[in-house]
Structures are given as structure tokens and as C-alpha cells.
Amino acid sequence: MSEAIFWGGVLRVAQSVSQAAPFILTGFIIAAVFRRWLGPQSVRKLFGEGTWRSLPQAWALGMLLPVCSLGVIPVMREMKRAGLRGGTILAFGLTAPLFNPLSVLYGLTLSEPFTIFAFSICSLVVVTCIGLLFDWAFPAKVEQEVHEESVPYGIKRILSVFVSMGKDFWSYSIVYILIGLSGIVFLNVILPKASFQTSVNGGDLWAPILMTGVAIPAYATPMLAMSQLGTMFQHGNSVGAAFALLILGAGLNFGIIVWMVVAYGWKKSVCWMVVLLGVVLGLGYGLEKPLYPTDIDPADHSHAFDVYCCPFSVDQSHLPAAVWQKLEDDVRPEETFGMISLFVIALTGLMFLAVERRFNLERWLTSSPEITDEKSRSMDVVLPNWVLAAAAIIGLVAVSVAMCFAYYPSPEECLEEIFIVKGEVLSAARSGHDSHAMHWIPVWEDWNRRIQVGVYLREFQLSDYQRMKARVVADYIELLEHAIEDDDQEEVKHYATLLARAHSRMVRAYQTVSKESAE
Amino acid sequence: MKMNPTGFLTRVAIIVMLSTSVGCLADNPEESGHAEHVIPEHKPADYVSAVEQLEIRTSNSLPENSEQRQQLTDIVGWLPELAAQTDLPKADWDRIQELSEKYQALAKQQDAKLLIQEIQADLDELKQLAEKTIELDAFNTYDQKELTDE
């Protein structure tokens, strides 16, 4: 038993680290840009500090910047250093991990795009309400913690960002991030494999409360949270629980809570948490009926939360090999890039810290360059720091938009991928190679979602016809999965046949669009 | 009241370690059997059966009880899904969805009489589409070929 829990914890933490790596990297970049290029005054200006716009502005910036609830920690710490008010920081910290361009696109192709619109408006209500209450109840004037010399133009200005990122890696930020990850271990210990499948069914009054308990320690990237919402709506699970999952699962973790207690003390943190939970649960129960999907057959379960439970059962063996295999299957190229980048940042951070023992790096970075050639200097336009910072932040947003097109390819490309995956699943299912089929089924489910987003991204619409064809395929994939789990060969063959037919129909539905758009 | 980060983090680490240890000692309940999709008994197997059901259920007078009314509402709601499991082209599917939405709106208004009248009025069209699905499914035999190839 303890072996399953141990290796389960190893797998869950490794999965979370790999998923979080690109977002943590982004968080360190944003924090360094805020510190070195923008500076405290411009950061306060960016967030509209002291004006009525500060909370909605924090919400809007949070929607644009691609960070998760772990990656947002360095940014929140930097915002506090810049002297922003608690309400604004917490509003940004809670919203930034909920949405990004990729996840919003994904959400808009769900059966009820209005739901995502309603959820995002409700998230604005949540952050505005608790931000206003927080700043009203605790109006203490926040002092800027440190005064920093600005970095002069030239190579030092670029280098200073890397120095900041490296040093930030070896600061309390990484401790809070590790505390955030401890929530995953905690859930792995208390939730046995697949034990949360039937806990948040639609109509269950306790579902939002139960989900709240799981969502706070859980870690979910914006994409994971959005795909879980999709699965919940597909299965007719509780809408209130889905809302709690989005706000608390994607937006909050143990690391943020601990940082908040350290930064603001127990009293303010408890008040903030109580108001947050009250508003989230209140809205969750309020949304339950109006947003409940009417065009689905409610299932009595959901697989969406299997990722929060222990991945292994007591009787499973060869767990280290299973962990390795799962990681090999799951880790995406962008996650590998994120992890390697973080490793490089960690190494350079160590190097900078070692250099600082013998040499005053900060003084060198902030000392002005000697201008030797006035003539060439006149041709060399020095851009102000805020221009570079704006370019960096807009660049991050632009990269995340470009990533949308890479992550959600054209329908033709998706269909080619699906064709390969379909062959793997159906031939493995029919020939009794269950583990092979079960490995490829989530891949097919993923491409089935991505083709819909890919069409939406390029056509700015997805017809109900295409959406329904994809839904029929998704339903049959799940029925086939259950048949394989039951080891019922007759059912496997039956659903494999139906799935193949549904796939052919879906291909025709999406090929028509491809041809029309080509013409 | 601000806290000393080091002291506070040490306390948090101890709490997390303790709670994790307690969790490890506790019995891990047996993994629950995996859940199933419950398909309602009155859900027709395909679009053709759904149209047959609509004809039967609207041939008599009003539904006798709320359960029958609910079942009728369910069936009209399933029409687009069942039609998507056929080879009907987009235009035909769109029409079925349009009719389904119209029926569901009437069902929401609790006007069973009007709902039945509307279904009866559209029944010929629904039947024609059902016949078309049979023809198309018979014509499109490539699925079977594809299965054999695999």
C-alpha cells in the first residue's frame, strides 16, 4: 500500500512539475521584467494602483499573461515589493492562473461557450468583490519595500533580467512553489485510485463543497482545468463544483496560501479565504441550475479527477517502471523545454550567487556605461526601460497566441494524427492488447478536442454539426474504454465498430470545412 | 501581524509531513469499481427508432403522466445526437436540430398538447429523413471495408 502511495506521489509531483515548468519559467520572466525594466513605479502604474481601475485591470492582465498558480508566485512577490495593495495582488494572483489565450479558446469550443463567458465574468466578480473588501477592511498604506537603482542601457540591462531570474529561483519563491506541490502529494495520500469519480454528480448538493476541499490543495494548469470543465459538462456533473474547480483548483494552492499568511498575517489571510470561499460557493450554487447542460445524458461519474487521486492501486506491481513509462508518454516537448530552461536558470542563479560573494554584482549592473564616442552614440537610440518591458510582455502574449496555432493545428493535420491514433486504438482493442489501447485512448480524446479548437481558431466558428460529430466520437471512445476495463470482448468489438463509423462521419464533417476554407 | 517566513515555513512543513504520515498509516479503501454510463431505458437505439417512438407516443391523446411527458421531452432532445450517428448531410442534420429545439422550447412551456400537435405536423418530414438515413447507411458500405482492412 505504502509503495503505491510513494510511487503515486512521485508520479504526480513529476507530472505537475513538468506541466508547470513552462508557466513557472514565464512567471520568473515576468517577475524579472517587472523588477529590472519596469521598476516599482511603473508596475504600480501598469496595475492602475490607487484608481478604481486597479482590480479590473489586474483581472484583465491576469487573463492575458500565461502563468499558472505556481508560476504566479514570483510575480505576486514582485508586485508586493513594488508596493501594490493586497487586493490588487490577490486579484491578479487568483485570475492569472485561471485563463490564458490557449485555455479560453479550448473553453469556447465546449458545448456551451456561454458557460465559459459566464465563468470568466463570475471570476471578475469574485476578484473584484474580495479585492474591494480586502482593501476596505485593511486599508493599511503599503510601503515600497526596497529602493533599487535602475539598470543602465546596454548589455547589462539584458543581463540584469537573467540575474534576477537566477537569484529569484534560489529565493523563497521556490519554497512556496514546493509547498504548492505538496498539495498534490497530500491528495495522492488521502484519495485512493479513482475514488473521486462519483463525488460531484449533477444535483448533488454537497458536490461544490466537496470539490472545494479537493480543489484547494490540487494543482491544475489553465489547460487542465479547462479540459476538466469540458469533461464535467460532458458528463453532466455539478456546475457549482466545476466553478469551484476552476477558481480554486487552477487559481489557488497551498503555496499561495502560505505566501499570503507570511506576507499579510493570519488575520487578513483568514478573512480573505473566508470571503473567497463564500463568494465562490455562493456563485457556484447560484450557477448550478442556469448553466446546467440540457443536451447531454448525465453520467453517474467523471474521470476528470482521476489525476488528483493516487494513480496506482494496491495490487499493482513494477511501479517504478510504470512511473517512468507514464512520464515518457505524458511529457510534451514544450514541458521538456520549460524544465531544461528552469534547470539552466537554477545553474546560472547558483553562479550569480557565487560571484556575489567576491564581487558586487548589483553595483556593477547599476553603474552607468562610459560614453566614448558621441558621434556613434547619437545614432544609437536608447530605448526607455518601459518600452522594453512592454515589448517583453506583449511578446509573451504574442507567443502564447502563436502557440495556440501550433498547439491546435489545422483540421487536415489533426485528421492525419487522428487517423494514426485511431489505427492504434482499434487494432489494439480488437486484438486484446488492452494496455496499448488504453495508452492511445487519451491521445485520441486529446486530438478530438484539438481539432474542434483548431477549426474555431481558423474559422472563428464551429458548427453545431461538427461539434455533435466530435461529441459522438468522444462518447464512443469512452464507451470503448469502459468495455476494455470490463474485459468484455463482445462489447469491445461492438463499440470499436461504432467508433470507426463515427470517426468516418466526423472526418467527412471536418473535411468539408477544410475544402470550403481552401476554396 | 506579519510573520517570520522561516519560522512559519518550518511549522507548515511539520504540519504537511504529519498529515501525510497519518494519511499513509490509514487504511486505503479498496478501489471502487469503475463507473458506468447509464443509458436510459427509453433512449432509442438510433434515429429511425426515435422517429418510430415519436409516432407511437403522439398517436394517442396526451401523455398520461409526467413520466411519459418527460420521456417524450428526452426523445426529442436526443434527436440531434441520434441523427449525428447517421450519414445524413449537414443540411438535414441542421433541420433535425431546428425541430428538436422547437420541441424542447414547447416542452419547457409545459404545453404538451401543442408539442404533440407540432410533432404530428412534422412527422412526415422526420420519417422521410429516417428513410434517407437507411438509404445512406446502406450505400456507405466503406465503413465495413475499412474495418475489414484493419
Where are these regions (language model features)?
Chain A
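Selected transmembrane alpha-helices and immediately adjacent juxtamembrane segments
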Residues: 1-33, 37, 41, 45, ...
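Alpha-helical transmembrane segments of multipass membrane proteins
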Residues: 33, 102-106, 182, 186, ...
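Membrane-interfacial helix-loop connectors
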Residues: 64-120, 192-269, 273
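Alpha-helical transmembrane signal-anchor/signal-peptide segments
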Residues: 294-303, 408-425
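Non-transmembrane, amphipathic alpha-helical segments
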Residues: 403-413, 429-436, 465-472, 484-491, ...
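Charged, amphipathic alpha-helical oligomerization/scaffolding segments
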Residues: 413, 417-424, 439, 443-450, ...
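C-terminal amphipathic alpha-helix
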Residues: 425-433, 478-519
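Short, solvent-exposed, charged loop/turn and helix-capping segments
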Residues: 447-471, 513-517
